[in-house]
Amino acid sequence: MKTLPVLVLSLTLLTVFSETSPILTEKQAKQLLRSRRQDRPSKPGFPDEPMREYMHHLLALEHRAEEQFLEHWLNPHCKPHCDRNRIHPV
């Protein structure tokens, strides 16, 4: 029972007086965040830019919808319906 407080006290003193303290100063934390952000490439999925992956997905969907629309309207086999010169597209 006496060994538990002694163990806790010794671990506390060890972490405080050695340079391996798990508590960082504000300056060290900001520097760590800055260096980490510069080291890793900026690609979708990183917590720095959470919306970027979703925006890439939306752009791909929009591009695919536009291709399907043009493929439908420029199809030579559906002339009376798809001819923009004769019929206004709704």
From Swiss-Prot:
Start and end residues of each stretch annotated as Disordered: 28-50
Keyword annotations: Secreted, Signal
Pfam families: DUF4543
InterPro entries associated with the record: DUF4543 (IPR027870)
Signal peptide start and end residues: 1-18
Compartments reported by the entry: Secreted
Record's GO cellular component terms: extracellular region
Full protein name: Uncharacterized protein C17orf67
